[in-house]
A protein has these predicted regions:
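Boundary at the C-terminal end of the N-terminal hydrophobic targeting segment
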Residues: 20-22
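Bacterial N-terminal signal peptides that target proteins for export
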Residues: 1-9
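Active-site beta->alpha N-cap acidic-glycine motif
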Residues: 31-137, 144, 256, 296
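Generic enzyme active-site microenvironment
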Residues: 67, 139, 305-308
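C-terminal domain-boundary segment and adjacent tail
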Residues: 107, 200, 212, 252-321
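Metal-dependent polysaccharide deacetylase catalytic core of the NodB/CE4 family, i.e.
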Residues: 99-102, 106-186, 220, 226-243, ...
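Active-site-adjacent pocket scaffolds in enzyme catalytic domains
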Residues: 27-57, 165-169, 173-268
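Bacterial N-terminal signal peptides
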Residues: 8-18
């Protein structure tokens, strides 16, 4: 029953996740593509060298990188939804959830990464400064949670640079990593990431281990910290109020899945990347499972809790070996 419920959640939320969006690739329908076209599309961005340190810094066995995508109101605004009710869900992320999350991280003594759309930073500059003051990382997450695959190359470049400048000004730190909104990639996203000389990306899914990204068959020097939908809170707890089917997964079921993911990462001496959203994980019944998950991972020996930039630097050191 649990497996069936989890699968239904993914199917019902696919449109909201952007999984059925038409890509702005300029390519003909797949059945009309030549073999050369297929090979070019598939080979545009690929996984390269495994960059897993053996061991991780401090002699640790596994790295744990917890992240929060601080979307707040941006996804609603992106879609043209200006309903005060809809926007209030985003406000919850900053007003109610963020204090809980920061207190939880303080209590456990761990640092995390917060991927922030620039519009969120402009709406809540004091929240961003509080995050930085506690020693957490601020990473890029688009301007207003736009879908990169629906933008032209120049539009995407302009928004990415504007996002970088905004985050740097408000946070007082220089972002070195990006998580694209909705993990959406255009054919030129990696090209722009390289132009901006970012250290890492955390949007692709070719592995669970950190790896070097290949662009058009060539090494980029960009570290990928892979993500995966089963390691994201939104597919389990997100809700579209206008959908005829509204999924709800018991928090303990999700906790059980994430524990199993960590157990295998631990056995493989690999990397555990968790993606959450303050306005989702920060609710009372859900912050509890994050607390339990962290406590569970802390109970094991040789676990390194680190910010994404710290993990990426440890992985990047493998490029020189």
């Amino acid at each position: 029953m649990k497996k069936r419920t989890l699968r239904l959640a993914f199917l019902m939320l696919a449109p909201a996740l952007g999984l059925s969006q038409t890509q702005n690739t300029g390519q003909p329908p797949a059945w009309q593509m030549s073999w050369d076209q297929i090979r070019t599309v598939v080979g545009k961005v690929r996984a390269g060298k495994d960059l897993t340190p053996k061991p991780w810094p401090g002699g640790n066995r596994v790295a744990v990188a917890i992240s929060f995508d601080v979307d707040n109101e941006t996804t609603s605004l992106r879609d043209g939804n200006t309903s005060p009710s809809e926007l209030s869900q985003g406000e919850y992320g900053s007003r109610t959830a963020m204090p809980r999350i920061l207190a939880l991280l303080d209590r456990h003594g761990i640092k995390a990464t917060f991927f922030v759309p620039a519009v969120t930073a402009k709406l809540y500059p004091e929240t961003i400064r509080q995050i930085v003051a506690r020693g957490h990382e601020i990473g890029m997450h688009g301007w207003i949670h736009e879908r990169n695959s629906q933008l032209t190359e120049s539009q995407e470049r302009d928004l990415m640079r504007k996002s970088y400048d905004t985050l740097r000004e408000i946070s007082g730190t220089r972002p070195v990593g990006i998580r694209t909104p909705s993990w959406d990639y255009s054919p030129w996203t990696m090209k722009i990431i390289r132009e901006m000389k970012l250290l890492y990306d955390s949007s692709l899914m070719a592995d669970e281990r950190p790896y070097e990204v290949l662009y058009e068959g060539k090494p980029t020097g960009v570290v990928e910290l892979p993500v995966e939908w089963i390691m994201d809170d939104y597919p389990y707890f997100g809700m579209n109020r206008f959908s005829t089917i509204r999924p709800h997964i018991g928090p303990e079921d999700v906790l059980d899945l994430w524990r199993k993911e960590f157990d295998v990462a631990y056995d493989e001496s690999s990397l555990f990347v968790l993606t959450t959203h303050p306005h989702i994980i920060g609710h009372r019944s859900r912050i509890v499972i994050l607390d339990k998950l962290i406590a569970y991972m802390k109970s094991r020996q040789g676990v390194w809790f680190a910010r994404h930039d710290e993990v990426a630097r440890a992985a990047a050191a493998q490029l020189r070996k």
